[in-house]
């Protein structure tokens, strides 16, 4: 059944939004896995755990925002299977941060591709929506992760476990 409110919302854009929702669901699931890995008693890095669980929440808010926009534009949300994260054992903080940065770069590219598709279909509402709610935040997050990786590498060395602990305590402390 077609929507009575749909206007200037292409089926290509609708499909790309559904694909992006799936990517955000996958990212949230991955960050949840990361967060609870670092919360384990044999890993015990509370600040790192908190950082990744906050990202899981942000991605949840992102996919809900995308789904709401999809409905407001007269599109239909089509849910797909969510794969389990590639890892169960995430290793040390730098390894996890590298995996997270790769995930964010993939999300950012999908957002840029959707923006380009919206521009090609002359959909200013979609472009404004992405610029307002997603694109700037992605760039800031990638920068933050890059900074964290730089600091983790600085703290590495023969006592890498101590460096990881200090990074967690001094950089990722939370209230």
Swiss-Prot record:
Pfam families the UniProt entry points to: Ferritin
Modified residues (N-acetylserine): 2
UniProt entry tagged with the keyword Glycoprotein: no
Protein name as annotated: Ferritin light chain
Subcellular location as annotated: Cytoplasmic vesicle, Autophagosome; Cytoplasm; Autolysosome
Gene Ontology cellular component terms for the protein in this record: autolysosome; autophagosome; cytoplasmic vesicle; ferritin complex
Function: Stores iron in a soluble, non-toxic, readily available form. Important for iron homeostasis. Iron is taken up in the ferrous form and deposited as ferric hydroxides after oxidation. Also plays a role in delivery of iron to cells. Mediates iron uptake in capsule cells of the developing kidney. Delivery to lysosomes by the cargo receptor NCOA4 for autophagic degradation and release or iron.
PANTHER family in UniProt: FERRITIN (PTHR11431), FERRITIN LIGHT CHAIN (PTHR11431:SF47)
Any GO molecular function: ferrous iron binding
Assigned protein family: Belongs to the ferritin family.
């Amino acid at each position: 059944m077609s929507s009575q409110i749909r206007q200037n919302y292409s089926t290509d854009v609708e499909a790309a939004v559904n694909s992006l929702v799936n990517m955000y669901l996958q990212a949230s699931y991955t960050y949840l896995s990361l967060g609870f890995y670092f919360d384990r008693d044999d890993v015990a890095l509370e600040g790192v755990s908190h950082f990744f669980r906050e990202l899981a929440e942000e991605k949840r808010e992102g996919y809900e925002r995308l789904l709401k926009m999809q409905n407001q534009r007269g599109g239909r949300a089509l849910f797909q299977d969510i794969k389990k994260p590639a890892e169960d054992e995430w290793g040390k903080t730098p390894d996890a941060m590298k995996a997270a940065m790769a995930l964010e770069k993939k999300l950012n590219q999908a957002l840029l591709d959707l923006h380009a598709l919206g521009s090609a279909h002359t959909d200013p509402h979609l472009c404004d929506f992405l610029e307002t709610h997603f694109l700037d935040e992605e760039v800031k997050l990638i920068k933050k992760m890059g900074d964290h990786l730089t600091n983790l590498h600085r703290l590495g060395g023969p006592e890498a476990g101590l460096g990881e602990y200090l990074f967690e305590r001094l950089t990722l402390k939370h209230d």
